[in-house]
Amino acid sequence: MILDTDYITKDGKPIIRIFKKENGEFKIELDPHFQPYIYALLKDDSAIDEIKAIKGERHGKIVRVVDAVKVKKKFLGRDVEVWKLIFEHPQDVPALRGKIREHPAVIDIYEYDIPFAKRYLIDKGLIPMEGDEELKLMAFDIETFYHEGDEFGKGEIIMISYADEEEARVITWKNIDLPYVDVVSNEREMIKRFVQIVREKDPDVLITYNGDNFDLPYLIKRAEKLGVTLLLGRDKEHPEPKIHRMGDSFAVEIKGRIHFDLFPVVRRTINLPTYTLEAVYEAVLGKTKSKLGAEEIAAIWETEESMKKLAQYSMEDARATYELGKEFFPMEAELAKLIGQSVWDVSRSSTGNLVEWYLLRVAYERNELAPNKPDEEEYRRRLRTTYLGGYVKEPERGLWENIAYLDFRCHPADTKVIVKGKGIVNISDVKEGDYILGIDGWQRVKKVWKYHYEGKLININGLKCTPNHKVPVVTENDRQTRIRDSLAKSFLSGKVKGKIITTKLFEKIAEFEKNKPSEEEILKGELSGIILAEGTLLRKDIEYFDSSRGKKRISHQYRVEITIGENEKELLERILYIFDKLFGIRPSVKKKGDTNALKITTAKKAVYLQIEELLKNIESLYAPAVLRGFFERDATVNKIRSTIVVTQGTNNKWKIDIVAKLLDSLGIPYSRYEYKYIENGKELTKHILEITGRDGLILFQTLVGFISSEKNEALEKAIEVREMNRLKNNSFYNLSTFEVSSEYYKGEVYDLTLEGNPYYFANGILTHNSLYPSIIVTHNVSPDTLEREGCKNYDVAPIVGYKFCKDFPGFIPSILGELITMRQEIKKKMKATIDPIEKKMLDYRQRAVKLLANSILPNEWLPIIENGEVKFVKIGEFIDRYMEEQKDKVRTVDNTEVLEVDNIFAFSLNKESKKSEIKKVKALIRHKYKGEAYEVELNSGRKIHITRGHSLFTIRNGKIKEIWGEEVKVGDLIIVPKKVKLNEKEAVINIPELISKLPDEDTADVVMTTPVKGRKNFFKGMLRTLKWIFGEESKRIRTFNRYLFHLEELGFVKLLPRGYEVTDWEGLKRYRQLYEKLVKNLRYNGNKREYLVRFNDIKDSVSCFPRKELEEWKIGTXKGFRXKCILKVDEDFGKFLGYYVSEGYAGAQKNKTGGMSYSVKLYNENPNVLKDMKNIAEKFFGKVRVGKNCVDIPKKMAYLLAKSLCGVTAENKRIPSIIFDSSEPVRWAFLRAYFVGDGDIHPSKRLRLSTKSELLANQLVFLLNSLGVSSIKIGFDSGVYRVYINEDLPFLQTSRQKNTYYPNLIPKEVLEEIFGRKFQKNITFEKFKELADSGKLDKRKVKLLDFLLNGDIVLDRVKNVEKREYEGYVYDLSVEDNENFLVGFGLLYAHNSYYGYMGYPKARWYSKECAESVTAWGRHYIEMTIKEIEEKFGFKVLYADSVTGDTEIIVKRNGRIEFVPIEKLFERVDYRIGEKEYCILEDVEALTLDNRGKLIWKKVPYVMRHRAKKKVYRIWITNSWYIDVTEDHSLIVAEDGLKEARPMEIEGKSLIATKDDLSGVEYIKPHAIEEISYNGYVYDIEVEGTHRFFANGILVHNTDGFYATIPGEKPETIKKKAKEFLKYINSKLPGLLELEYEGFYLRGFFVAKKRYAVIDEEGRITTRGLEVVRRDWSEIAKETQAKVLEAILKEDSVEKAVEIVKDVVEEIAKYQVPLEKLVIHEQITKDLSEYKAIGPHVAIAKRLAAKGIKVRPGTIISYIVLRGSGKISDRVILLSEYDPKKHKYDPDYYIENQVLPAVLRILEAFGYRKEDLKYQSSKQVGLDAWLKK
């Protein structure tokens, strides 16, 4: 049995080593004959000698290709000839491959990146883990005790525990008297003893839990320190463990033994909320182990008892690790056999990598050349690519019995229907596109279904249908009318109670449609109705003199005039058509004056007289046509009331009378009423007619309708939203009793798919199935068969239309075919065997086979320049704000929202010059993203959160290169700023404009003044001049030129030799507005000879003040200090701001007179500093007061300035933007003053600046970078941010030796990369200059690092990378030229983010087209299968991953937000699958909620619809606002977060609705819930963000099965029918695509998608999505949930489950639950200083830390929640601190937040609410009141 392989080098040549176990003995075999090679494809074979002559260098040795052999291979199914280039040593390949690829004769090189030892296994056909050897397993674990903040490996190892099949023991160097503890003298001896045990026991497999990243690296570190050689391996040459970097973590290899780290395997295999050893042990094996709290660790060294607890804890860790290892190792061994690589590699690989290694091995066997991995550009393209998703069926909720788990309705031809325009016809004669009479009136036929049927038909009142056809039945009680769909066959059983829905107008409507009059009669009626509404007949007699006859005559003029709206284009076309058809003329069409109306006129007498006659006899015309014309012109569809309304004035009551008579003749119900009002002293009346009820609307739509499509659509919408809840006999519907019989029938049966009008509030969840490997095989889906030319046979994928050649087996399908066959054979063996061990091993094997077959985040700080002002913003909030404010300008491009901007600039890096630049931001960008995100932390404390496809910058060979988020790892070097460029200028503060942003109450007593001298009458004169310029003054004032000269100085006008020219009209308009306010509000103050105006009177116009004028004004309080309006920012003002931001205070308080007093105080203990503060303050604000430790500036203007510029509290203080606009001396002055207040010299000789504000900490770093200070570190301690500076500043030199930070060093790896030789350590810039100047370094290469010495960037090293899942928006800026910007905590340069993960983007055999095709076929076959089993075998499918929806949705199309019915998105049928129709959408997004409850936009790739065949409920929000949803549709309720609930489960709960302005959501409780009758379409959309990915050409998804039952049938019948169905459906499914019978379950319930539980015939419970293990759940919650599951599934008693919950709730409320069941265990996952949010466990941990108790990451805090008020975190104590005499736990918390949430996710499926589960009827004002009842 091969355990592993590697290679060593002897005499410069590689020797393969094979680590094996044979006949129970370990051995190492050597093979010195295997040579490394790559393949090269050449344009010209004659160049091979040149290629062989190419030279490279490896460790100082010249290397070249040693041989070249021409070989025949296949590449993507095509024959190719390539050269096999053979090398002497594996390391020669990277030394030469780049040069070979660059040769002009080389097209490309292949297989150059396959590691040598792995290549050996592939080429030799060797399979690790094959054989029957029994492997010895041993697990170990260490316990350490190091202080928080200490470096890794500094603290001592306390204990080492180990476990194997024989024993579990602990080694320690403390005296502990326990039988399983071995005590040695010290830590060094303990490690030596452990090494001895490993060598004695000689395990083949050494198991750890996170041993790669903790136990082994820590052990290695301590062994090095103590001088112990860790001889853990079996390799005599290299017996010590070796640490390898693997992605963003580490991996430790022990040669000769398999180091099996469980952690990555568990993370890949099972889904848990937390992956602590305790949680995994309990979830996988159902066992628990002891927990050790932080307080006990602290007391370890104090008591022997504590040491015993630690020893037990350590021993149990080792035992749990061993037992888990035994569980998981066999599956990984099977996977290793399948893949053909070692367990060490396989167990640490992602699914994508596993598939790739498998394909590489098969490719070699088939002589197939492997494609290369994508380069950077191709990788980005793949990341941006998306494709259409799979199919899902909504689960049928509730408890079901006798469920079969399978992996993977109609009328006879003479059934009558009414077709619009035809009347009654046979259903067999209906055509697609016809309109037939449906429940909503006329409904368009989208699809006619036809099937051959032989069997029983059910006859219900003459309606014949197949047994499974559904008929709506109405039942009534005192409270509501309920409409339920019942199967036709159920009517025979007598169980159906109620009435069926009919229409008494069936014959009448049919007659109308059949006996419609001629077109002429219809046109006459429509014209008459139009003129009745908005037309006029005008006759005018005019007297004139007829000169030819010499006498007076009378001229009779006739005119017909119709007025319509300019936008009523369809009505205009109809009127013109009518005049043409009836009279053969085209009337005149003109715009009516300046209105938006059109006037249609004709002056022909004959036409006039004919129309006059029509109007006289209007009541005898064809009533529907008259009404259609009248209502088109005079009626509106009221969208609020969902009614049709006609309104006529006082003198037109007769028109309403005519309309009413016509409606009566058709039987259309209506209401009439009058509205009286007074206008111009005259009483007037409005006469109103309204069609209100659903029956009236449907009759109007059916018999009359509108002319225009817009009004018809509005009417359809009104019908859709009208109520069906109180269904009773009315003008359209009739409730009838029924009679039923049955008869035999053989022939064709038909069904219709109609357009309907359901709506749905955005919660589209699409999950997916993975029968896809079979599809790949069946349809030969592979990159080498895609669109292959010259084939005879193709399979074409539905929906997407890609063609796949069937003439030869594709590479991937042929491999998958073998895998599928292999798995099927294994599963057959599993079913046949009764040996439990063999069954388990076979299961491991089939699971291994199945595994194969199958930008910037929002809270990052961003410095930008907006409208000329430097601002620090959170990137997400900033971009969201802009996109919200400019919605109409947002474009959507490839799932990305883009907003082009022109007033924003970013701080950017020129990658060529390495200089900081300020660059224009071209666009703001945001993407929707779901996937991995990375928190990257640098040694300097800088942090940034980025997506996997977002890039930072690093240095490679002296050049700036991008490094992706997923590639960043600990130790990498990242570029950060050394110097940031600013727009330095003379900075001034316009005080009036600055304080104009404050509330009016803050500036109520502020005035502005200007001296009278020289300004007498100036303001009035200027206003008159301005009015004259604007043409509003008839006479020019005498002193006009004086004002004109002034306006020229201000730049508004230009004087010409004669006259003037206005150069800035807009500016002049604003200037005039200012002067209008000044003239109106200016007052003369004689005491001071000044003009005065109250600031608030001109506040909204102060921005119009020209600076030249403003310089002559002062601003201040009426009786207090006033200062110049324009304040020049010099070094002194910079110091004032620095003093204030660091240790200043600004406050306002009531004084003794009842008014307000304002002051700004600057604090310091140093008298010299106080003196400087005083001098500066008096310079700007006049007299001040000096106290013992502060300078008090009692001036309101100082307060307003400080508040506006810097903020007033320590937490919101900020550096004002004006500092960043100022010159460098001003910035230094600010920094110096800030350092005086909040700076000090740290004991480590570093300078330190402190602040409580995260914003201010980032601003300080930015300020320092702007001054060229780069040796910076950022820390966070006790709520305070610390910015450490490790270099001298101009105002402070410590003259002491300091450790150099990374930004002031050149890392040795950079030096080695540039100079090609070893460097012992990093070197300082000074040392580098010294070496360069002395000639010790190559001057040419020195220039490559010039940017570090003289550029604007430095390097910082990655300290930590933490990966997590993220869903939501990610953000970008498009920056002109550079496409990068400064961002993140502490600020670093970042590039654009590319996101999205559809397919495995680094795959060699990647193909988007294959992915889309496989998914399309998947949808097709799943829907077909479900349709067949339901309709032909009578099953009810309970769960198969699906989605329905039926509400109005809010969409964004092409960047524009719209409120539309979902049906309006369905514009065409792009493809059909079964009875479902699909319309592909472009640039459409739906509004939905993310997991954080935030409104976000998600892409909608398609909309789907099908006929509703289930109950529909109407949920009333208000009396007029409701939503209709199907019975199994999920709504989202706000309860302990966001939860799914069905319509009948939401009573008493809050739904989530959008605010009117879409600014957020609000919570609303439904008014009523009622069942309605509905027979239209239901619609579905996919919302992007589903879990799917394409890995190396193979689609990996979840379940490919579904659960089904036949209600009421016996188990044996169901099993039999299920197997019959399998035989039937598999004969219809192609190729390998077969459905399997996976099992039978006695009982099960289905809560929601991916959430169900079933129990099999052996009593085994299987759950999905109903986790009973959660980190922050107490034992009582987990125990209660488990009991509820057993009661429902094992005992078939939901009632018992409810009683269990009630009993537990009562026991908790009465304090009868043992304390240990209430303990909540939570883990500390990071340093306490990093926690921003303080949860209960963090609160306790911080209390322990305050007592001197050390709490490290990984510590479990076990706590109890106490009764009381206030935050939970203030009411928690450790279990050990609980005193029953003093403390009471909080029953309310444990009931509401623990037990009920744990069980409600199950019991809600059965209609139970929270209130139903309490042992008392309700809870009024808290638990105390409840208990006292």
Swiss-Prot record:
DOD-type homing endonuclease domain sequence ranges = 527-668, 1136-1269
Which Enzyme Commission number(s) are listed?
Answer: 2.7.7.7
Q: Does the keyword Nuclease apply?
A: yes
In terms of superkingdom, the source organism counts as Archaea
Q: Which reaction does it catalyse?
A: DNA(n) + a 2'-deoxyribonucleoside 5'-triphosphate = DNA(n+1) + diphosphate
Family in the record:
Belongs to the DNA polymerase type-B family.
| UniProt name for this protein | DNA polymerase
- Which species does this protein come from? Thermococcus aggregans
Organism lineage string: Archaea, Methanobacteriati, Methanobacteriota, Thermococci, Thermococcales
